[in-house]
UniProtKB/Swiss-Prot annotation:
InterPro entries: Ribosomal_bS6, Ribosomal_bS6_sf, Ribosomal_S6_plastid/chlpt, Transl_elong_EF1B/ribsomal_bS6. The keyword RNA-binding applies. It comes from Streptococcus pneumoniae serotype 19F (strain G54). The keyword GTP-binding does not apply. Belongs to the bacterial ribosomal protein bS6 family. This is Small ribosomal subunit protein bS6. The gene is rpsF. GO terms for biological process: translation. Transmembrane segments: none annotated. Keywords: Ribonucleoprotein, Ribosomal protein, RNA-binding, rRNA-binding. It comes from the Bacteria.
Amino acid sequence: MAKYEILYIIRPNIEEEAKNALVARFDSILTDNGATVVESKTWEKRRLAYEIQDFREGLYHIVXVEANDDAALKEFDRLSKINADILRHMIVKIDA
């Protein structure tokens, strides 16, 4: 299984319940498409280097994932691009 790390930035003015629902939804997108979520945690609220959609801060969330193929990652990528609550995301393959 290949290991991946996903980092995404959530808009800072989101309510706690909505943030938890968003994280649960995107974790389930990964697991429903065959990936295993090893760890999913909110990192912290950080100042951005530049404005993204009129925001100067963002909530960073990091997810460690194991997957046999990239179907789950492609679906995560597709849905996170159209979600207004996710400002940016990045998927990185970890070399073991």
